[in-house]
Each structure stands twice: as C-alpha cells, then as structure tokens.
C-alpha cells in the first residue's frame, strides 16, 4: 500500500470530538478510520520513515488535504496516541490537497445504450459510468511525487503542482463564473441545459464577451 485516495463528499472531512473511539471497529468517520490505519501501519513498520503513504483527498472543500490532516491530528490527540506516532503521521506521510474537475452524471440506465456500449467495448462492465470529455486533476505535492503516481504514463490530464490555489481560482472564475453569468437570462429565454445554450449565438456571444472583459483580466 502506497497511495490512499479519498472522495467522501464535503461532509466526509469532519471531526467531532468523541464520535469515534480508538478501539471501535470500525471508527465512525473517515478521518478516524484513516488515523487508525496509519497507527497500525506505524506500529507494523516500527515507525520507519519510508513507510508513509501518499494521501490524495478529493473532497470538494478548500485545502481538503490539510483539513483531513487536521482531523487526523485531532483524533490522535483524543486517543492519547504517543508523540512519536503523531510526528510520523505528519512527516512520513504526504497529505495532498487536490482539485478535481469533471462532471460524472451517473451510470447508464438505458438497457439499449448499455448493450451498444458493451458490444463496442467487447466486454461487460457492471460499473460502467458516464463522464464528460473534459477532466483535470490538480494535486498539490512535493517534488518527486509525480514519479510515484502512474497518471503521466497513462496519458491522463493530471498535474502535480506546488500550490493548487491558482488552479482553483481559474476554475471558479472561468467555468463557474461563465455558468453563473448566463444561466438566469438563458433560463428565462427557455433554455434548460448548457449544451443548448452554447448552440445559441446570442448566449454564447454574451458569455465570451463576459469572460474576456470581466473574468480573464482578473486571473
């Protein structure tokens, strides 16, 4: 085990004093579960500094990796775990904040569509899902982290950067800002989905003008 990826929703990265006990199987919250896993790993490898994990937090909150680390520290203190373990947890492990940007609307429910995809793929996949073409995963991490992750070799759009903040600012101001800017007028004009809005010259022209004159100049 080298990498832990979490996506427990915005509510998953939370600490509540007393909600999980050290000997509880399993602890209630994800941060408590992770703290216990890290403690067992620390014990099994006798605190070896090279046995830490890379922890990629994908929850949609600011500084998700740092917030997860704070929660783990709170549980370690609640459980009176020794200072040597807490030091190992914070220094041998890498808690990475990340930004994930891809819309995944859900599994395919139409049997005919599923059958056509299975025939095209040549196999049956019970977990087949649908996602938009665009996707990006920005991981805030130290030098050398990219070498541990297989994404670059796979050719997917994943970046390891020293600071995820400017990438989040770009997403919020361009993508989210564009949607917020045209959605009210588009809805009143009878449009229900973004695709149809982008096929309308007036709405698309308004959005482009708004982005170039109001959004992009502030990034």
For each feature predicted by the language model, list its residue ranges.
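Substrate/ligand-engaging "lid" and interaction regions
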Residues: 1-216
């Amino acid at each position: 085990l080298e990498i832990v990826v979490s996506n427990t929703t915005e509510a998953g990265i939370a600490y509540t004093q007393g909600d999980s006990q050290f000997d509880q199987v399993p602890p209630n919250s994800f941060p408590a579960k992770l703290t216990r896993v890290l403690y067992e790993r620390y014990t099994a490898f006798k605190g070896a500094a090279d046995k830490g994990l890379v922890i990629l937090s994908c929850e949609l909150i600011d500084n998700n990796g740092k917030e997860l680390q704070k929660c783990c520290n709170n549980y370690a203190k609640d459980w009176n775990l020794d200072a040597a373990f807490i030091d190992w947890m914070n220094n041998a492990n890498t808690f990475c904040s990340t930004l994930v940007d891809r819309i995944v609307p859900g599994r395919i429910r139409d049997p005919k569509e599923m059958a056509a995809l299975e025939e095209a793929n040549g196999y049956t996949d019970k977990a087949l899902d649908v996602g938009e073409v665009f996707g990006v995963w920005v991981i805030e991490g130290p030098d050398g982290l990219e070498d541990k992750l297989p994404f670059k070799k796979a050719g997917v759009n994943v970046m390891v950067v020293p600071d995820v903040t400017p990438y989040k600012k770009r997403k919020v101001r361009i993508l989210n800002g564009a949607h917020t800017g045209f959605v009210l007028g588009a809805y009143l004009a009878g449009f229900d989905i973004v695709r149809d809005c982008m096929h309308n010259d007036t709405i698309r022209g308004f959005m482009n003008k708004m982005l170039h004159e109001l959004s992009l100049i502030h990034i």
